[in-house]
Structures are given as C-alpha cells and as structure tokens.
Regions:
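Short loop/turn segments immediately following the C-termini of beta-strands
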Residues: 77, 120-123, 142, 187, ...
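Blade-level signature of beta-propeller repeat domains, shared across WD40, Kelch, NHL, RCC1
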Residues: 336-381
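Beta-rich, blade/repeat-based domains predominating
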Residues: 53-69, 99-125, 163-191, 199, ...
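Short loop/turn segments that connect beta-strands within beta-propeller blades
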Residues: 86-91, 141-146, 161-163, 206-210, ...
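Asp-box/WD-like beta-propeller blade repeats and closely related beta-sheet repeat scaffolds
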Residues: 45-48, 125, 130-188, 201
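A short helix->beta-strand "capping" segment at the edge of beta-propeller domains
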Residues: 32-58, 163-167
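Short, solvent-exposed loop/turn segments at conserved positions within beta-propeller repeat blades
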Residues: 77-78, 125-135, 197-198, 250-253, ...
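Fungal secretory targeting signals
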Residues: 1-32
Length: 381
C-alpha cells in the first residue's frame, strides 16, 4: 500500500520506540508471548532476512502468497507490472503481467485456484499524484502458466517472462480517486472490497459481473492532507475476517474495525478504533492477520509492529514494535505470512519494501526488496 508522505511532520527517525507489554497470545502450539517493554532501534528483536533486492527505482507495493507453491505474487507501484517472487530465491523474479497503458499496480489478492486480481491504474511515485478514473480491476490467471524465455520486464528488470498467463480486465473504477488496498469479501460470489485512499471510502467489486458500488463511506476512512505534508491518504490497508473489516488510516495514524455484511460489504455497525495515533514513531502501511488473531503491520520507517488478540475477542490495546532499526530495511509496504511447511515452523512473515518513498522524487531512487522476518522467535507461532 502507499505510504502517506509525512515529510511535513517527521523527517528523521527517533532513536527509541516505547511499547507497552505484550499481552499473552495463544499460538498454534499454545505458547505464550514474552513481555517486551522498550524496543531499541539498535537492538531489534527480529532480524531481517533479505530474500531479493530489486534494481534502484523499483517500488514493490503489495504481495500475496500463491497457494499453488508458497511463492509470492507481487505488484510494483513504480511500473505497471506483476511478478512471481520465489520465497527462497530459487529463481529470479518472473514477470507475470504488464499493463502498457498504465503506470502502477497496487493491491493484489488470490481468489480461486491460481487466479489473482489486482488494482491497476496511474499513480506517480515521483509526485505522489494519482489520476482519478484511470483505475480498474484486472484478473491474472496462472492456471496455464509455464516459465518462458528470458525477456525484458522494463528498463531495469530483465527477467524470465511467464507463458500461459491470461490477463483480463474485469471491472472499471471510473469514480475512484486512488483505489489501493484490496481484500476478498466473499469468494463464492466473487466480491472484493477496495480501499479508496483519496476519497476515504470502500468500493465493492463483483469480479464475475463487473458491477461496482460504494460499500462503506465512514468518517474514520477520510483523508486529512493537512496532517501529512499535503498528501490526502485516508484508508490504506484493509482485510476482511470473521464478519469484520479491518483497516488503517494513514493520515490520521489510526486502526479500526467495522462489522460488515459478508454478502454486500456494507457496514452493519459503527467503526471501532483499535489503535488511535499510537504509531507515532513507526507509521504503518499495510498489515496482515495471523492465526492467533493478531495484526502485524508493515511500517514505513522499517518496523514490524504487532497488535495482539484483535480478532479473537481477547484484544488488549497497545502497539508493540518487534523489529526495526536505523540500518535495516525501510519503506515497508506490505506483509503476508508464508504458507510452506518451513514457513509455518519459522512463523515467516514476508514483507515488501520500496526502500524509502521520498527518494523516488530525486535522481537516485531507492530499491525495493522482499524480506523475511521469522516471528517464531517471539513465541507467537
């Protein structure tokens, strides 16, 4: 997801992030989480394992595990491209899809066996400007996929290109300002929910019929550009789980959940604030849920932050930074848990990065990465 430009508020990293004690969380093995008080940037609890580094100027925006093999489908914000990334670096990035008339690909999800849906449109990583009305939802079907010859991806990415991938537009979003995060609401009826960061609302998209509608328009989702150097970026990441839609707001630095109808996506209750401006030194972008009901945030300043028991009824407020320092990866954009047997043993959380968003407006933009954090060290898995 796109990070809110907070240059007007925070230009430097602080040296220490203060965190409350971790609540006890039951993992798959009924282990309990240790207590953590103060997190030092120079001594992070979790160390990054860099799996892949892209060329300079490559903003990796979002990723989702591929159920077929445990690798990852990843999107680029800096180019209209979608790649298959090896979770073990067993093969170079495999170009799955290109959209020549567009500039960027944002959220991506898997719906159906080896079928993915992505938000595609025009967004500038240099100016942070979106082109309203340029977006659509595209289907990327990998069921016929095979590795092809070595062909160029874009100017700086010469990579293997997939054969047999079928790409189809399934819906236009002519009234969207900046469709960003994406989640599956109802796999049976083909309903996706899309966060519109510019308009501060959620769209529903039926990928079978192409029908779109505003599902939720709640004040908690609204952007507030005055809080972040002029860039209006409200609701950002979102995820549906067990009757609730979870989402963060980049401008207001908040995290919410709201009860929704699992057929229409419309709200059936008020928004509930789960974290209100508790991200002062870390600023979350996208997030993911774990098997124990916790939320894991990928944060712009290089942190992995954790909020325990959110979807289990055992929620206790308090954000804890469990990874991040001044020399580790920055510009974390998305986080997803791995699905292979080895990933489950390690509690492997895979994170995409842009390397630092403010560099993309200059002559020497940063380089995105795929990074793995093994959370089993914390006792959560």
């Amino acid at each position: 997801m796109i990070y809110s430009a907070i240059a007007g508020l925070l230009l430097t990293l602080t040296s220490v992030a203060t965190a409350s004690a971790l609540p006890e969380v039951n993992s798959l093995e009924s282990r309990q989480a240790p207590s953590v008080s103060t997190i030092s940037f120079s001594e992070p609890i979790l160390s990054p394992n860099v799996i892949l580094t892209f060329p300079n100027g490559t903003w990796v925006e979002n990723l989702v595990p591929r159920s077929e093999d445990g690798n990852f489908v990843a999107t680029l914000l800096s180019a209209p491209e979608v790649y298959l990334l090896s979770s073990t670096n067993a093969f170079p990035p495999l170009l799955l899809a290109q959209f020549p008339a567009k500039t960027s690909v944002l959220g991506v999800v898997e719906l159906g066996h080896d079928v993915f849906y992505a938000v595609v449109g025009n967004f500038s990583v240099k100016t942070f400007a979106s082109t309203p009305g340029s977006y659509g939802i595209f289907k990327i079907d990998l069921n016929g996929h095979a590795v092809g010859a070595n062909k160029p991806g874009h100017g700086k990415l010469s990579k293997l290109t997939a054969k047999g991938v079928v790409v189809t537009k399934v819906a236009d979003l002519p009234d969207a300002g900046l469709p960003n995060g994406l989640t599956v609401l109802n796999p049976n009826t083909g309903i996706l929910l899309v966060a519109d960061s510019a308009k501060g609302l959620v769209w529903s998209v039926n990928v079978f019929t192409g029908k779109t509608a505003i599902a939720i328009n709640d004040p908690s989702m609204a952007p507030n550009a005055t809080l972040s150097g002029g860039l209006g970026l409200g609701i950002n990441g979102l995820s549906f789980d067990s009757g609730y839609l979870y989402y963060d707001n980049s401008n207001t630095v908040t995290f919410y959940r709201i009860a929704v109808n699992s057929t229409t996506g419309r709200a059936t209750g008020p928004a509930q604030a789960l974290a209100d401006q508790e991200f002062a030194n870390i600023f979350p972008d996208d997030f993911t849920l774990d098997f124990a009901g916790g939320i894991w945030f990928a944060c712009e300043y290089g942190h992995i932050a954790y909020l325990a028991g959110v979807s289990t009824g055992k929620f206790q407020p308090g954000i804890v930074a469990v990874a991040g320092n001044t020399t580790g990866p920055v510009g974390l954009t998305s986080a997803k848990f791995g699905t292979t047997a080895e990933d489950l043993k390690r509690g492997s959380l895979y994170v995409s990065t842009n390397g630092g968003p403010f560099t993309y407006g200059g002559a020497h933009p940063a380089q995105g990465q795929l990074v793995r954090y093994d959370t089993a060290l914390l006792g959560f898995y």
